[in-house]
Amino acid sequence: MAKRDYYEVLGVERGAGEAELKKAYRRLAMKYHPDRNPDDKSAEEKFKEVNEAYEVLSDAGKRMAYDQYGHAGVDQSMGGGAGFGAGGANFSDIFGDVFSDFFGAGRAGARGGPQRGSDLRYTLELNLEEAVRGTTVTIRVPTLVHCKTCDGSGAKKGTTPVTCTTCGGIGQVRMQQGFFSVQQTCPRCHGSGKMIADPCPDCHGQGRVEEHKTLSVKVPAGVDSGDRIRLAGEGEAGTLGGPPGDLYVVVSVREHPIFQRDGKHLYCEVPISFADAALGGELEVPTLDGRVKLKIPEGTQTGKLFRLRGKGVAPVRGGAAGDLMCRVVVETPVNLSKRQRELLEEFRGSLQGNSSHSPKASGWFEGMKRFFDDL
């Protein structure tokens, strides 16, 4: 049967570079690898075809001969079955990370020893007051802990793990795959060299069981959404005597009905009456430390910002506290009584012809008049 074009086999253009060839080869080698396709002769043949194509195209000399003469130009240099390992392809370079993903390890001892437990993440919701002042909370976290029945060994009480019969206790097995052989982590003992002949009935040989752990978390003052608190050793238990992982508590601060936070500064809106805005006055505004008095000068407009220094948030890593920025919103009176309406009508009449009472409005009308005059 005629051989397929090597570029077609790898699914690349004839001008493909080294990186593109390598990427295509890795993808196809993973797809057709015999361990992923047991008892599939078609996949095995495609795996060999992919190896052969890459051996030629990854070697500059062989690729040049192939581009000029086709398969005839490289059949002799291939040595009639010298195999993938005899060519220009670098086995460890290409397959080191492939087998690391595929088998869980590609080199001796990669998984043979104790394994650290996985880290855990827990989202902790706080209100603004708790985040600013700091607090201590109790949380319940689902995790994996050492099985107390077998003390984490995975073996039934009174028994011990035995030497793995698949790898003979070395944790690695050598597999012949077509043109080459590969040493991989033992699929039965996962590199430990030991196997559980009589598993623990509680953890089923895993050495760990699911459990909810109750923990006390001290939250420092000044935290904000996205800040993380690390609790060392409070993650999942390790395996084969490995250390536990860590627990990361991620802070999420709920929205506040009054204040908005921006770093160490707080913002709020303060509604004031039309009369207070015009005549000035004094009112109480809320802060996280209680109410404080704010003096409103006469003629205050909507949008005016008043800064209350030091009434913001003290940064979690130290430094001066931020400020509270109060934005004034002048409210228009509604649901007027007859008398109130009469007074406002009288007031409006007194303003006509006197631009000094409304400097912004007067300037706007003057600008509009000039605009239309210029048309």
Curated annotation (Swiss-Prot):
Keywords: Chaperone, Cytoplasm, DNA replication, Metal-binding, Repeat, Stress response, Zinc, Zinc-finger. Binds 2 Zn(2+) ions per monomer. One of its GO terms (molecular function) is unfolded protein binding. The keyword Chaperone applies. It holds the Pfam family DnaJ. Its main location: cytoplasm. A zinc finger (CR-type) spans 134-212. Zn(2+) 2 binds at C164, C167, C186, C189. The keyword Cytoplasm applies. Its cofactor is Zn(2+). Belongs to the DnaJ family. Participates actively in the response to hyperosmotic and heat shock by preventing the aggregation of stress-denatured proteins and by disaggregating proteins, also in an autonomous, DnaK-independent fashion. Unfolded proteins bind initially to DnaJ; upon interaction with the DnaJ-bound protein, DnaK hydrolyzes its bound ATP, resulting in the formation of a stable complex. GrpE releases ADP from DnaK; ATP binding to DnaK triggers the release of the substrate protein, thus completing the reaction cycle. This is Chaperone protein DnaJ. It comes from Azotobacter vinelandii (strain DJ / ATCC BAA-1303). The lineage of its organism: Bacteria, Pseudomonadati, Pseudomonadota, Gammaproteobacteria, Pseudomonadales.
